[in-house]
Amino acid sequence: GCVLANRLSKNQKNKVLLIEAGGKDNYPWIHIPVGYYKTMHNPKVDWCFHTEKDESMNNRSIRYPRGKTLGGSSSINGLLWIRGQSNDYDNWRQQGNNGWGWDDVLPYFIKSENNELGKNEFHNDSGPIMVANKKIKLTTLEEFINASAEKGIPKVNDFNTGDNFGVGYYQFT
């Protein structure tokens, strides 16, 4: 929604009206990185959806937070910047969704970023979305990462390369 509206509004010939079901994103917890927890299942900013029951999960359904505020789900995602596994995108393409494979969408991810890691095969340094690393390293998290590595879980230095199985610090917007 917002991304498309922004792109369309760059052409002065276009007039764009963006309608969101929720209100302004002035709920304080939206703007605090750890505050995403307070947005989940809060009907003020979340649609409070649940998945269908799944036999492989003992017929449980799980919460599926979806933003009901200006900015949609991007406003309640904890400011995380994680693209997802490349094989998930490739599976979408294999199911007939041409244009949705990892190699198809990666250029758009790259184009959108202004990443403090700089420009490389997975990142850009001149896009509209500022992406940054966590500035503070917490001892507890470092110990968790090291313990995970001792158990054979790989350390991931960049969760946006398409192979994000492992443990590490993720980036923020």
How should each PLM-predicted stretch be described?
Residues 93-173:
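Conserved redox-cofactor binding core of oxidoreductases
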Residues 2-110:
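N-terminal glycine-rich phosphate/pyrophosphate-binding loop and immediately adjacent elements
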